[in-house]
Amino acid sequence: MGVSHRNRMCVFACLLVGLIGIPVWVMGASEIPGDTLYLQAEDAVSEGSYEQAYHLFMNASEAYAAEGNGGKKKEALRQAKRISWMFAEMTLNRTAADETIQTAFPNFTADEREAFLEPGASIQFESDGQVYYFEGIARNIQYHNKTLSQNFTRKLGESPFFDQISPYISAPRDEKNPLYQNHTFRGTGVLSIPRDQLPDTGTLQIWYPLPVSIDSQSDVQVLSVQPEEYVVSGPVTTGTIGEVYLEIPLEKFRDDFLNVSVNVSWTTSPRILDLDPETIPMYDTSDPLYLRYTKSQPNINITPEITARAHDIIGDETNPYKQARLIYDYILNTLPYSNVPHSYLAAMPIPESDFMHNTGFGDCGTQSAYFAALCRAVGIPARAPGGYQIVPGHQGTHFWAEFYLPEYGWIPVDVTVAEAADWAYNATPEQAKEYKDFYFGNLDPYRFIIQTDVDESFSGEPNPDILMTFV
């Protein structure tokens, strides 16, 4: 979603200040040429002085404005915005990070807290000589420790996902077992933006996600889109991503909130594995599907290091189904779930798969992209679909993974939901194994699927004049 630029610089500058938490200082635009300031900003970026670079890009935009160079002014603002996103979730200095850990885990000693502040022990980066820590540092400490995670679910009195799925895995697959039935859902999505957070005039561009029709998600119906008169294209519910695109003239709205709503219904089916792993046909390596899903893409990146890791994981195994299982087990057993600062990754930019490989930290999207990258690195087509998981009582955005086998099609894998067995205080070892086995090759019907792969894009590209974006 974006706002086209028409006298919007002040709004964009305010957004940057709010994100980065540092004031904008501007030298007289006539004192230093815009190109000089821009080059100084690029030098600051290369030196890791991102705050200094932010100020220099902002100053460059002012200098370019004074010089009458609107194109370069916008580019300088875009670069400043990119830097601001580095700091959007990396908000804690060392003292604040230590206090956050102490609040969450008051029984930790000072030395124990200090260990989590060291390089490699938490998500952090350095700018202008200061280390910044991810605001989710305490949550990640819990996720990386089974005892802490199980203490949390014990206190909660519930083991999310595990409690909702595990009892039905081995139960009779009859009409009383919801895990093996189709489910029809109806939902309304509402986007409500405070009017005072938007410019007075201009065009608000909105790409609103919708469910997409695939084998396990059918009978997709878009019942309404409001305000209907501003729909430019769509609704689209076929292909690789579901969407409806709107353009809203802001000068026509004066209410306290600008509201956009979509009402949809869809039917989901469980995906249950039924194959003989000993009879997997050979891949046709010239097939367009094979070529597409075994190459690098922005967030499923195949590096020499990832390729080496993938071969270490699979060893001498040549069966692609068994190779994928080895990769699944590797991630599940050695790379625990973590919250991730995606705005920081996008700004740097760092591919999701690279971040997981290099740091050991990853949420559902990062784990799924890494699974796909490891599979692709050994010649297994793979991808990372996404949307929402809608397990009763535990709805939220979600990604998982799929790998492709000839004659069988796309095989689902959900490392993240499988890991819920490790967080469950009430899971026996046998139950945990059964639950983890289920999520390799099978998928529950509690999904709202928007896109078939992580790097699928909405139709068209945002207007190049867009300066403000919302996630």
Feature map (PLM): residue ranges:
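Secretory targeting signatures
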Residues: 1-30, 401
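Alpha-helical segment of the N-proximal tetratricopeptide repeat
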Residues: 32-59, 63
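Hydrophobic/aromatic-rich core segments of domains that either
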Residues: 35, 39, 43, 47, ...
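Acidic low-complexity segments
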Residues: 45-48, 238-245, 252-354, 358
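Short, charge-rich amphipathic alpha-helical segments embedded
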Residues: 55-84
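Intrinsically disordered, low-complexity N-terminal segments that are enriched in acidic
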Residues: 79-272
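Solvent-exposed loop/turn segments at secondary-structure junctions
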Residues: 267-269, 337-338, 361-363, 389-392, ...
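Active-site nucleophilic cysteine motif
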Residues: 320-327, 360-375
